[in-house]
């Protein structure tokens, strides 16, 4: 059993009581919250935890963290759930050591996934080998939050230490992608699924930031320095320093020194290269830059995103540059911002035209101090569930019954986070 049904039921009843004015929210919340626990989580023979992303039979390092993060509230009082989350960290770190460039993995070494179409250094554990900086940020975030929220430290084992070293090494190598062994080519007509220049990626100059091949949408980067992911890296490198200083883990001194250096260099790169101006002449963050003078003004609905910067802990909600960036990306100046009959929000190159993502609507609510805006977004999310009672990857702004992905656990859990945030359960 991955959790105590009695403890979780008691907690759900407490949430329902707090939200009794909003029965529609409660209905969707309970369905989403229990579905992830009951249908995506599996405890493996070694005690580690595998978390299915939903309707794709694989585990993403990013998604799995986001899927279990809302359970940290209950994990304080449920030892089984606490061990389930610690088991996920252990599985994530083990898989990172199988290949730190991969974004998603199989439950066993079964060679399932994109092996027939992809030209890259694959092994049987890998479902897909699209290198995304955030895939390495998320497991560090979960390990840290589990410790801070519950006091759990069993996740900080020898594998965690070794994987942390590997992450620091990879991010350092990718500060100059010319030194990288990573290449990725897919046999496809969809240009977003492969890298240009024979799998090397687009042209760039060294900036101090760390290079990324793909976005958290699993679409390739137009320019190779993805600003939201570098922001996230700065945050989790601070977590690494705090963990190793407080718990005196193996090789603490060298790991702290490497994390501190890398954090400073990436932050300096952000400060030197990440800014641009919007159509009003306001200073904003670019979404991607290449160090050669090119920058994109847009945002993607997946997390990390520019919209999510305060949610990730990179800046305050009232930060002036963030607010200018927020206004820009929630406007037609962002080519992936769509407005329609039922909703408005962020879409993606990964999905159809005029389809927006519930994940981004949840993040919009989690990054405002305006209670009325949070309520409006929650009402919108529930009204746009396509009659299914759960969230989806995306839906059409003029017809929510048109949506992508029947079962997308990450979106379900982001909705749950926004409900808890609205109820001041943090």
Model-derived features: where do they sit?
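Extended ligand-binding clefts on enzyme/binding-domain cores
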Residues: 97-101, 108, 168-234, 247-249, ...
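Short, solvent-exposed segments of well-ordered alpha helices
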Residues: 51-58, 123-130, 134, 158, ...
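Active-site-adjacent bridging/hinge elements
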Residues: 36-46, 110-118, 203-215, 336, ...
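Well-ordered alpha-helical scaffold segments within catalytic/enzyme domains
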Residues: 7-21, 66-79, 138-153, 231-251, ...
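C-terminal capping/lid segments that line or modulate ligand- or cofactor-binding pockets
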Residues: 118-124, 129-132, 296-316, 354-426
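Aromatic-rich carbohydrate-recognition surfaces in CAZymes
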Residues: 57-85, 89-191, 409-425
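Extended, well-ordered alpha-helical scaffold segments
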Residues: 28, 79-95, 152-172, 240-243, ...
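Low-complexity, Ser/Thr/Pro/Gly-enriched N-terminal "stalk/linker" regions
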Residues: 1-62
């Amino acid at each position: 059993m991955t959790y105590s049904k009695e403890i979780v039921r008691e907690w759900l009843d407490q949430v329902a009581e707090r939200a009794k004015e909003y029965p529609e929210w409660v209905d969707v919340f309970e369905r989403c919250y229990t579905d992830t626990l009951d249908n995506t989580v599996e405890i493996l023979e070694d005690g580690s935890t595998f978390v299915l992303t939903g309707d794709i039979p694989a585990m993403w390092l990013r998604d799995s963290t986001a899927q279990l993060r809302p359970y940290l509230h209950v994990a304080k009082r449920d030892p089984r759930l606490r061990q389930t989350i610690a088991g996920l960290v252990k599985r994530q770190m083990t898989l990172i050591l199988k290949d730190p460039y991969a974004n998603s993995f199989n439950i066993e070494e079964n060679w399932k996934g994109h092996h027939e179409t992809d030209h890259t250094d694959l092994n049987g554990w890998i479902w897909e080998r699209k290198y995304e900086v955030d895939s390495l940020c998320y497991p560090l975030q979960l390990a840290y939050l589990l410790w801070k929220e519950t006091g759990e430290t069993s996740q900080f084992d020898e594998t965690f230490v070794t994987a942390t070293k590997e992450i620091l090494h990879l991010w350092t190598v990718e500060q100059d992608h010319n030194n990288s062994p990573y290449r990725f080519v897919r046999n496809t007509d969809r240009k977003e699924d492969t890298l240009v220049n024979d799998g090397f990626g687009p042209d760039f100059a060294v900036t101090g930031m760390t290079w990324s091949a793909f976005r958290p949408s699993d679409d390739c980067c137009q320019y190779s320095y993805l600003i939201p992911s570098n922001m996230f890296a700065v945050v989790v490198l601070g977590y690494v320093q705090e963990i190793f200083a407080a718990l005196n883990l193996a090789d603490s001194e060298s790991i702290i020194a490497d994390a501190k250096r890398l954090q400073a260099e990436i932050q300096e790169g952000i400060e030197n290269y990440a800014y641009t101006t919007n159509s009003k002449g306001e200073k904003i963050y670019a979404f991607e830059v290449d160090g050669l003078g090119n920058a994109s003004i847009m945002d993607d609905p997946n997390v990390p995103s520019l919209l999510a910067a305060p949610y990730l802990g990179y800046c305050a909600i009232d930060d002036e540059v963030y607010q200018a960036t927020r206004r820009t990306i929630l406007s037609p100046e962002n080519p992936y911002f769509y407005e329609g009959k039922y909703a408005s929000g962020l879409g993606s190159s990964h999905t159809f035209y005029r389809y927006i993502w519930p994940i981004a609507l949840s993040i919009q609510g989690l990054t405002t101090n305006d209670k009325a805006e949070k309520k409006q977004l929650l009402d919108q999310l529930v009204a746009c569930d396509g009659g299914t009672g759960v969230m989806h990857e995306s839906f059409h702004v003029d017809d929510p019954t048109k949506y992508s992905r029947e079962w997308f656990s990450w979106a379900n859990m982001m909705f749950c986070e926004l409900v808890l945030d609205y109820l001041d359960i943090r």
